[in-house]
């Protein structure tokens, strides 16, 4: 974008602006948003000061940020995102926005140069005093001395929580001389101390808990918007007590008890740990002199204001909203007199003392003394939308008028394509700038702005893809923490005390922890399991592979088995029979597929390439991969049967559309089968819009079509006139004949009935089939399904998705009203989820009284199909503002304009349901809001409480997400294998079921488990060899290390585990050293065919297998073991060698030496 700033910099108009910008009060009029951004960015580039850009709301701030990222390095661009919503302070919010706010405040506190975008309510928000924030900025360097207690205390003040193992943002832990911290910004950090001196600082991976790179120094930012020290707490106690005493007599007697509960709920008097998320509601009482963000800026900062009049309007409504919100919470006993979240001074008063530059599109009167007014003439660019003739004549006009023409396109490919297009129009163009650009020609560069603009006085026009082809702007990515779904799902298998487990031989029990027991004078660790009644089982940790966490559907509580009974054997036999039947079916399908002959497509045509380039968005890597996989399938002679898995709105439709286009280009017909009329309509509209410039005949068959239209479509399918037909189960009726069906696309197959599924099967015969589903399919099942059905997965969301802002809060009509008004004021729509059909109409009346001007509709499952569809369609077409609905909206409907979801009694829903419902909003480039309400002061059941806790962590990083993924995975497994299997999965747990299914499939396919060359080794030594609690206190970590030791087969793995132990827990004690020695002995034994090493008191018995005995070179062995002298005796028993070793001092070292010698004496067999 340098070309653009160069042209602007040289212009006289800009130079006039530049002289007064930041020097005196100035009004700049006439500039469109993108032109304004270009000027502001250039001013910033030329100055050495901080620049503050104030907008009226967060939505506007986001839009300007996207454009500014084209000119300014992301490292220097900061935003202070505060939602335009009071309720925010009362709910648990996602860490994304908070980490952006903290990044901004930290940069300001450090006096960094930057361009800072702040919406009005961010400007007015009460904050921690600047000096206190500055005192809590910590930079740690290797070699420095630190006071550990003081340091940990500071972390707590900054909002960090102490845990035994760090796994989430905002946690820290202390183990021996190792401090782990997971800050909101940057990588998790591990600090190793030598006494009080910092010995090393390393990044570490929270999933593996292993260190990565060493760093010399690190900044530790706060984990909360507010710093809360002991002094703050004592000030807060006094202030809150006074506020409580002031408020109590002034409110209605009926709510005084509620006020008392609210007062006590802050636990200021009995707790030593304070939850920052809750205490920030009391910010008005926290500090003697709170700051606003303006106090964080340098005294010479430059201030730019975007649309003053809009800001004043927002300020008015913000003040009214804030007043009414505070009155409501005081009247209902949820708040105190004096409580506030924003400074009530006028916006102008806040920025007093700074020279301000006001940008306004139109000339306007302002109650401000202005020193300068600068007027620009700026015109919008004609929207061409691909109309070649208009484009040519407009470009010709620019050339004739000697304009500098800057064309912005988003990818390198499009640069070439655009240049070819302009050369056809005889418009001179260049793509690289060698010297300064001459007027009367176009320069085509990679870049993107939200819109183009024309500045006639400068002789400059900027044209973007939006005007050229109607495409949407690609949202710039800022730094985000990437977390793969595999990692998200991994940790649900962590064992916590109280979890249900499945023991392969004993069935379902409960995990009670790891216990160290003394058996025959030696200490060992055992896993303690509780079974039915008082039965308990202690499983040695080296047999822990027989124990798995019980994972099943969310609401499924398994019953415990009895130890020693036959019940578990029967259950397992039943499941075994069922998986064998499925394996049989799968294998038949597999054989059938391998033998089938289908149509083999050729490589992509030129039309296909053009069609794909027309897609206005950038493909995500997963989409691109899925498309390649599908095309590869189509280009083989074997018919395709592929399942495409991807969350709602992750772009499965575009993948399907490209496959459909490929089929049509080779003269084949496509049938697109969907479960509901509305979905059919939506897919039909998408296809029409995507293929409008190509000769493709698309028809719809659903209840929205007249009998006459349906008849014509049937005729067209028969003659081949219709290329693509989209429809509901009507497509499955017997009287439909295709001339040449090549591709069948089925959306959400599991939602069709049994009869329809049978019919789909017959349609599938020798035709390529692509099935789409939004329910994730578990990876473990992918394995056993491989070769039976191919699978593509889309796990990355499209670029311009904002994460849905999730709030969990108590049910309160003033919160609800605010949320509804907020969405309707931005012309959006609301889903109001109320799951009680009997009183759903009363709920609608209640909302109507709250929002008299809103159009409110009701949708529930007891309505006739037709009524329901018509209501939904009217809602999609924007005829209603609010839809009060049951969970019927959980699946499939796409309403991009509905971006607020309110769920009453969220504690009654399953997490996976909430996760899917939340996917209904945030489907466009606007921020989506989800409010999960739970009844006030209601005693929640334990599960509901856990569930709400999990929902609170429901942002991408939370465990709630993992549980939802787990439950959906199980649902996906049920869909894939049939309903009755769901029950079997619940009886034995998901992992054991998957394992049994995989074994059965492999057996049927004749794939034998590779029989281990070496038999299992039993090592039994009377030694204290375990992981003491003093060394590793966290049980999950302990189990994890034991699992690794159990799976160790090489010396590299042993070295790796030793490194990990020192890295995570510091130097290990003698018991751990012995444990590692035993594992080392076991590895030697594995490699040399030893089957048993047994401690018999004074001697150690060693047995080799017959095969190992044949392979051993006796001469080499005797020579090598001479140092052992007479302590070693060799014998033969049943053709197998036995060795006894007499125990002496340092016998463990002798044993290690002996097994190493045995391994080195093995002859390498010929096959190797």
Swiss-Prot record:
Organism: Staphylococcus aureus (strain MSSA476)
Keyword set includes DNA repair: yes
Function field: Couples transcription and DNA repair by recognizing RNA polymerase (RNAP) stalled at DNA lesions. Mediates ATP-dependent release of RNAP and its truncated transcript from the DNA, and recruitment of nucleotide excision repair machinery to the damaged site.
Subcellular location: Cytoplasm
Location (main, coarse): cytoplasm
Annotated gene: mfd
Segments forming domain Helicase ATP-binding: 633-794
Major enzyme class: hydrolase
Pfam families to which the protein is assigned, alphabetical: CarD_TRCF_RID (PF02559), DEAD (PF00270), Helicase_C (PF00271), MFD_D3 (PF21132), TRCF (PF03461), UvrB_inter (PF17757)
Protein name according to UniProt: Transcription-repair-coupling factor
């Amino acid at each position: 974008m340098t070309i653009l700033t160069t042209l602007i910099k040289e212009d006289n108009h800009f130079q006039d602006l530049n002289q007064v910008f930041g020097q005196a009060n100035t009004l700049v009029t006439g500039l469109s948003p993108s032109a304004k951004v270009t000027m502001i960015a250039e001013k910033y580039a030329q100055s050495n000061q901080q620049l503050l850009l104030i907008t009226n709301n967060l939505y506007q701030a986001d839009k300007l940020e996207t454009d500014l990222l084209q000119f300014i390095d992301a490292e220097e661009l900061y935003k202070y995102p505060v939602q335009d919503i009071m309720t925010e302070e009362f709910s648990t919010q996602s860490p994304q926005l908070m980490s952006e706010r903290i990044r901004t405040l930290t940069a300001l506190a450090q006096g960094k140069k930057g361009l800072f975008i702040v919406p009005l309510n961010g400007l007015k928000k009460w904050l921690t005093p600047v000096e206190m924030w500055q005192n809590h900025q910590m930079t740690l360097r290797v070699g420095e001395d630190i006071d550990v207690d003081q340091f940990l205390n500071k972390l707590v003040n900054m909002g960090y929580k102490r845990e035994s193992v760090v796994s989430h943002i905002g946690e820290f832990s202390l183990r021996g001389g190792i401090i782990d911290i997971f800050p909101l910004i940057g990588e998790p950090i591990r600090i190793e101390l030598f006494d009080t001196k910092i010995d090393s600082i390393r990044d570490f991976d929270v999933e593996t808990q292993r260190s990565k790179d060493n760093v010399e120094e690190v900044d530790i930012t706060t984990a909360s918007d507010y710093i809360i020290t002991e002094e703050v707490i004592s000030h807060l106690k006094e202030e809150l007590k006074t506020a409580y005493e002031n408020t109590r007599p002034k409110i209605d007697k009926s709510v005084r008890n509620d006020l008392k509960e609210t007062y006590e709920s802050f636990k200021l008097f009995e707790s030593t740990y304070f939850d920052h998320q809750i205490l920030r509601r009391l910010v008005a009482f926290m500090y003697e002199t709170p700051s606003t963000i303006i106090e964080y800026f340098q005294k010479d900062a430059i201030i730019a204001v975007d649309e003053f009049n809009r800001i004043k309007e927002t300020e008015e409504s913000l003040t009214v909203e804030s007043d009414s919100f505070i009155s409501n919470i005081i009247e209902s006993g949820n708040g105190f007199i004096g409580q506030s979240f924003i400074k009530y001074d006028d916006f102008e008063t806040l920025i007093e003392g700074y020279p301000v530059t006001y940008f306004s599109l139109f000339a306007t009167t302002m109650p401000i003394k202005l020193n300068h007014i600068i007027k620009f003439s700026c015109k919008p660019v004609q929207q061409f939308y691909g109309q070649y003739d208009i484009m040519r004549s407009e470009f010709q006009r620019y050339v004739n008028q000697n304009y500098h023409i800057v064309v912005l396109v988003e990818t390198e490919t499009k640069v070439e394509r655009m240049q070819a297009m302009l050369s056809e129009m005889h418009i001179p163009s260049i793509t690289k700038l060698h010297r300064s650009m001459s007027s009367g020609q176009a320069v085509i560069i990679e870049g993107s702005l939200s819109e183009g603009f024309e500045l006639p006085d400068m002789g400059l026009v900027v044209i973007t893809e939006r005007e050229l082809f109607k495409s949407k702007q690609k949202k710039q990515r800022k730094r985000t923490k990437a977390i793969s779904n595999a990692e998200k799902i991994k940790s649900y298998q962590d064992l916590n005390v109280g979890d249900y487990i499945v023991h392969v031989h004993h069935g379902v029990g409960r995990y009670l922890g790891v216990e160290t027991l003394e058996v025959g004078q030696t200490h060992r660790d055992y896993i303690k399991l509780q079974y039915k009644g008082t039965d308990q089982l202690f499983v040695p940790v080296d047999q822990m592979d027989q124990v798995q966490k019980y994972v099943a559907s969310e609401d499924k509580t398994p019953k415990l088995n009895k130890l020693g009974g036959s019940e578990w054997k029967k259950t397992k036999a039943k499941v075994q029979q069922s998986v064998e039947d499925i394996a049989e079916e799968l294998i038949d399908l597999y054989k059938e597929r391998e033998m089938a002959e289908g149509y083999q497509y050729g490589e992509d045509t030129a039309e296909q390439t053009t069609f794909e380039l027309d897609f206005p968005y950038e493909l995500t890597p997963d989409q691109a991969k899925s498309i390649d996989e599908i095309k590869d399938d189509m280009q083989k002679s074997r018919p395709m049967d592929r399942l495409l898995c991807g969350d709602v709105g992750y772009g499965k439709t575009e993948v399907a559309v490209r496959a459909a286009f490929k089929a049509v280009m080779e003269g084949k017909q496509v049938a697109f089968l969907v479960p509901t009329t509305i979905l059919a309509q939506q897919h039909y509209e998408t296809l029409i819009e995507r293929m409008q410039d190509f000769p493709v005949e698309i028809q719809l068959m659903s209840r929205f079509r007249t009998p006459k239209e349906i008849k014509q479509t049937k005729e067209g399918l028969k003659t081949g006139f219709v290329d693509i037909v989209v429809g509901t189960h009507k497509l499955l009726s017997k009287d439909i004949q295709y001339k040449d069906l090549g591709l069948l696309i089925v959306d959400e197959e599991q939602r069709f009935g049994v009869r329809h599924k049978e019919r789909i099967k017959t349609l599938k015969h020798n035709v390529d089939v692509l099935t789409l589903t939004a329910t994730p399919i578990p990876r473990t099942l992918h394995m056993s399904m491989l070769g039976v059905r191919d699978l593509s997965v889309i796990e990355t969301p499209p670029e311009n998705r904002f994460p849905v802002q999730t709030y969990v809060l108590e049910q309160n009509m003033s919160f609800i009203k605010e949320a509804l008004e907020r969405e309707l004021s931005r012309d959006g729509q609301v889903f109001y989820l109320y799951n009680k059909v009997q009183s759903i109409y009363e709920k609608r009346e209640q909302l109507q009284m709250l929002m008299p001007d809103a159009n409110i509709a009701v949708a529930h499952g007891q309505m006739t199909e037709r009524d329901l569809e018509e209501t939904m369609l009217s809602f999609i077409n924007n005829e209603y503002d609010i839809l009060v609905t049951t969970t019927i909206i959980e699946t499939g409907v796409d309403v991009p304009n509905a971006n607020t979801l309110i769920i009453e009694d969220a504690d009654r829903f399953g997490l996976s349901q909430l996760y899917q419902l939340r996917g209904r909003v945030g489907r466009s480039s606007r921020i989506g809001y989800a409010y999960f309400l739970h009844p006030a002061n209601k005693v929640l059941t334990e599960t509901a409480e856990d569930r709400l806790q999990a929902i609170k962590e429901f942002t991408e990083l939370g465990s709630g997400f993992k549980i939802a993924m787990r439950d959906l995975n199980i649902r996906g497994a049920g869909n894939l294998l049939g309903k009755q299997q769901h029950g079997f999965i619940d009886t034995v747990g998901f992992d054991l079921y998957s394992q049994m299914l995989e074994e059965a499939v492999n057996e049927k396919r004749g794939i034998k488990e590779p029989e281990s060359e070496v038999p299992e080794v039993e090592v039994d030594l009377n030694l204290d060899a375990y992981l003491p609690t003093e060394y590793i206190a966290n049980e999950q970590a302990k189990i994890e290390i034991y699992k690794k030791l159990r799976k160790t087969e090489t010396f590299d793995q042993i070295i790796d585990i030793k490194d990990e132990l020192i890295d995570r827990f510091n130097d290990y004690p003698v018991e751990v050293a012995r444990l590692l020695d035993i594992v080392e002995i076991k590895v030697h034994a594995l490699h040399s065919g030893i089957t048993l090493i047994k401690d018999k008191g004074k001697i150690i018995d060693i047995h080799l297998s017959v095969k190992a005995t044949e392979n051993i070179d006796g001469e080499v062995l005797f020579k090598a073991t001479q140092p052992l002298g007479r302590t070693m005796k060799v014998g033969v028993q049943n053709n197998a060698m036995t060795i006894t070793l007499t125990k002496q001092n340092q016998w463990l070292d002798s044993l290690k030496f002996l097994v190493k010698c045995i391994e080195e004496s093995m002859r390498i067999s010929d096959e190797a």
